[in-house]
Amino acid sequence: MSVYRLFTVSIMDMCVLKANCKDPLGFTVEYTCVFGISSPIPGLHGGEHVNSYGEGVCVITFHNKDGRVFWFIIEKLPKKYTYPISPRFTPQDASEFCGRLADVHVFNDVTVGHLWRNRTVVSMNALEEGLLSTWSFERMVLLGDSVHKMTPNIGQGANTAIEDAAALASLIHQMINPMTPQNASKAAIGHLFQKFQDLRMSRVQSTVQRAHFGARFHTRDDHLKALVGRYIFPYVGNLVMARTVKVIGGGHKIEFLPPPKRSMPWTAQTDHSQHKMHGSKVLWAYLSHPDQHWSDDPRGTAQLRSQSLGTHRTSTVGRTLFIELVIVMIDVVYARQDIGEDVNAGVKDMAVQSRNSMRFLPYVLSYGSTESLLAAGWRQVWVFRLLSYLFGALLGL
């Protein structure tokens, strides 16, 4: 638990706080993580990011431009803990943990053993998860991990804390701005803190839910997640990345400072309708040109590699049909997590996404039939691609 949150809660208790404070210890632990930094490893290239999914364990790596590898190995614990009861780990625990998983593949021939042997920094911690309903008391306010904690699977823990700070700074600046002076009384400050929580709660709740789902999806927590993670996600990495970027783009910024110049403009300045591609369109493009990278935004993509342990990309009719049909489920899973701000940023609701996915089913069948001909010996690939374009045009893709 954060020292600051513990201190605030103790003051609340001493003052016999009458406000709603039902969850002062509301964090749970279901996963553990070994975090490390390693020197460059052959096969893991700078600027790339790898997600490797397995049974009960996943490996996430980020590689900087100099080749250094930042990595997380996340494993589900045998039991669930509720704070303040939480497991603690030593360097010896981390060594035994990585030794037990040394042969687990990260990407191609790279294994956990390579990460461990090249380590320069390593630590092992329990991963707390949760979102508290009370963020402030009188003139004290909490933000970041002190009120919302998540696993690192979607990489938004620190970003969410930074967004908290930006939103709070903007509200404080608004209060003390000489052009619009406001009374900084105890009541006014309490109102400001409540406004801050109300402003952030919806987005933070969505982010915590996405991280919660991500941890369980990456570790194949049930049969459905295992099915999609093993046979679908290795083929739609850019689609996932594009949607993730769209969600991140809706973050709160410091309102009284101009946005820095970047290659990508701020979300509020971007017309998403100019470069929107639905999931079915991305797959159609991928199937027509499997050697290309595809993204929602034509201005460029990052290199993301997704690997499901034990999966090999063999071109079969059954695999193709299966991948195309399950895209309906992928759209629905993402749409179920949409909130108001996502819709405003250009993410369609579940009904529209499902309808667009179902429109894609006729093309699925046509593609499968065409690949059957190819498998039977009809090797004129240009004919296959012509048919792909034709069916795509007929369906308005």
UniProtKB/Swiss-Prot annotation:
InterPro entries registered for this protein in UniProt: FAD-bd, FAD/NAD-bd_sf, FAD_mOase_fung
Gene Ontology biological process terms in this record: terpenoid biosynthetic process
Binding site residues for FAD: D145, A158
Gene, per the UniProt record: trt8
Gene3D superfamilies xref list: FAD/NAD(P)-binding domain (3.50.50.60)
Function: FAD-dependent monooxygenase; part of the gene cluster that mediates the biosynthesis of terretonin, a fungal meroterpenoid that acts as a mycotoxin. The first step of the pathway is the synthesis of 3,5-dimethylorsellinic acid (DMOA) by the polyketide synthase trt4. DMOA is then prenylated into farnesyl-DMOA by the polyprenyl transferase trt2. Methylation by the methyltransferase trt5 then leads to farnesyl-DMOA methyl ester which is further subject to epoxidation by the FAD-dependent monooxygenase trt8 to yield epoxyfarnesyl-DMOA methyl ester.
Molecular functions (GO terms): FAD binding; monooxygenase activity
Protein name per UniProt: FAD-dependent monooxygenase trt8
Disruption phenotype: Impairs the synthesis of terretonin but accumulates dimethylorsellinate through the decomposition of an unstable intermediate.
Pathway info: Secondary metabolite biosynthesis; terpenoid biosynthesis
Family the entry assigns: Belongs to the paxM FAD-dependent monooxygenase family.
The organism's place on the tree of life at top rank: Eukaryota
Cofactor dependency: FAD
Active site: Y53
EC number per UniProt: 1.-.-.-
Keyword Flavoprotein: yes
Keywords, comma-separated and alphabetical: FAD, Flavoprotein, Monooxygenase, NADP, Oxidoreductase
Pfam family, one: FAD_binding_3
